[in-house]
Structure formats: structure tokens, C-alpha cells
Amino acid sequence: MTTALALEYIPRRMEELGYGKNYYIRFRHLTLQAGELLELEAYNQFYILVEDPPASISVISDFGMYDLSFGKTNEQSYEHQGLIYINNYDSIPNHLRFIQVIPKHLKTEEKK
């Protein structure tokens, strides 16, 4: 998914989930060392994968999987939430980019 498409998708998705414009976005550029496994806790937020990563990187979360090296999946997920595992299977460092979407936690009165 391109960054432009993600930035177009995010407002619609957040509206769909009932947050309207009550969220923050953060651009995240992760560098994974050779063989590194990174674990992210994203239970109350979303990570939108942008700029397709190398085939040697896999992203597995409660929402789905993005892993071009795994031939048995018929769908690659770009939206991730919950516990996210990011694995660099390569023998060299690799880069991965996400847009992190963090809903604002507002009082009930403020949501109206």
C-alpha cells in the first residue's frame, strides 16, 4: 500500500469504527537487524503497512499476516492490530514503514 493510499484510507476506516476525526497518526520507520524478531503491542491502535517491505520480512498480528515468502496464504494484510510480530529473515538489516493510528480516548460528552 502506498503512503498516499493509506492516508486516504485511514479517515474512512476511523469513521467506520466510530472515531471520526478523533485520532492521531504517526509515521514509523523501523530498522530490523539481520535475523531480528520485533514484538509490538498495539491493542488500542492500528499499524498500516506502507511501501511493501522486502520478501524476507514477515508481519503477523491478531488482524492477519503479510509474508510474501509464505506461499500458502492467499491474502496479504496491510492493517495490523493487537500483538504484532515482525521478523527479518534476511542476513542483512531491512527497513519497514508503517503509519501508526492512535485513537483519542475522549469522554462520552466530547464525542458528540
Language-model region placement:
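Short, surface-exposed beta-strand/strand-loop-strand elements in extracellular ectodomains
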Residues: 50-67, 96-101
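Beta-rich globular "head" domains
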Residues: 21-58
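C-terminal interaction-tip segments
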Residues: 2-27, 90-112
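Short, solvent-exposed S/T- and G/P-enriched segments that are highly enriched in secreted/extracellular
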Residues: 26, 30-38, 62-78
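Noncatalytic modules at the cell exterior or secretory-pathway interfaces
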Residues: 43-48, 78-99
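Short, surface-exposed linear segments at secondary-structure transitions and domain or protein termini
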Residues: 75-80, 106-108
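Generic cytosolic/nucleocytoplasmic N-terminal low-complexity/intrinsically disordered segments
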Residues: 20, 71, 86-87
